[in-house]
Amino acid sequence: MNNVISSKDNHNHTLVFTGKGGKYFVICLVNFLLTCITLGIYAPWAMVKCRRYIYTNMTLNDQPFAYKATGGALFVSMLLVFIIYGISLSLIEHGHPGLGFTLFGLLIAIIPFMAVKGLQYQAMMTSLNGVSFGFQCSMRRAWWCMFALPALLMVALYIVLYVISLITTAIGGLVFNIVFLGLLAIIGMGVINGITYSKWMTLFGNGANFGIHRFSIQVNVKTCIRGCVLAMLTLFPFAVVIGYLIAPVFTDMIFLSMTGNAQAGESVILQYYGQIMASYFLYFLAIIVVTSYLYVTLRNLFLNNLSLANDSIRFHSSVTSHGMLWRLLVVFVISGVTLGLAYPWLKMWLVGWLAQNTQVQGDLDSLELTNDEKPLENGPLMWISRGIMPYFPFI
């Protein structure tokens, strides 16, 4: 029995992160100085250096990851996007609003396509044991999941809230309507996030590959919706308290405006200064609480349902909401107090904790290490998209 347990344990590999805060601080300091000196031009190279340091100090089964992206590729991409954006603004300002808004609208509409190409580039530039990752998916499906579906759901939510507001206006008072509609809006946003993120997980999980081996995932949409709704509901008590604290300020400001004494607004702000600052504090605390719960929920749901090479390799995430919450609080508070000087050490501490709670289950030694022979695309869309680094809150 001991031999069996030992064998299973040998097939459970935890990510190991060996990055040091001191070295990362030097990288961040040099990046900051060079970015300031070059008026932001060095920013793409700075991002690559930071990401490369993290990747090369992350190991799986004693093998480090590698990151081969270049600052030049990212710079060209960002420059092209900036040029297109600048041309659209110039057309709008110089009497051609139709052309300007059309160009700007096209730029917004192709963001999902750019995100896919950006993911392809970032995946191809990331490797383990000399084998590169990859990503392929249908452009039509990507546009639907990343752009059309969220937009349609937002429109549907607005229509539902508008219709309900017409009904409740004749039934309840102003306070009841605000609280009730606010609660419905929070729940609706949770449902939209749940549906959208479940589609993103499926798109990303089933489109990724490691060499010749493909990843696969099956996500329960109801579980994703439930997690997102619960995450959004944590906003409600904060919103109630903030509303209670800030309501007298707006009441007095409206009263002064109606009596023609709007100049006395500064005295009202000074009178309620403590409540205003408390509201700001609760607002940022609410953001951190929601971010922690949502990130952990989505990350665990994604990794715990992800597999590689026909389910021979599986993944597991054991991060907790309370663990993420207090770490994010420490990162924000200490970084703010030290004016960002402590951030590199805190960043390494947080990444190390995430690595310790990420396991790969399976016999990695028996996995065939063969690269996918498909070359990286080199078309215009790829050139303009290499600097796009989509953020997914479940990775």
Please state what every model-predicted region is:
Residues 86-107, 157-189, 239-291, 347, ...:
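Membrane-helix interface segments in multi-pass membrane proteins
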Residues 10-11, 16, 24, 76, ...:
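Membrane-proximal intrinsically disordered regions of secretory-pathway and membrane-system proteins
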Residues 33-42, 170-171, 333-342:
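Short hydrophobic membrane-inserting alpha-helices and related fusion/pore-forming segments
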Residues 2-24, 28-161, 189-201:
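Transmembrane-helix bundle segments that line or gate the permeation/cavity pathway
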Residues 111-120, 149-150, 185, 189, ...:
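Hydrophobic alpha-helical transmembrane segments of membrane proteins
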Residues 21, 70-83, 136-156, 217-238, ...:
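Loop-to-transmembrane boundary segments
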Residues 55-64, 68, 122-139, 202-224, ...:
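Juxtamembrane inter-helical linkers in multi-pass membrane proteins
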Residues 2, 232, 247-248, 268, ...:
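Intrinsically disordered cytosolic tails
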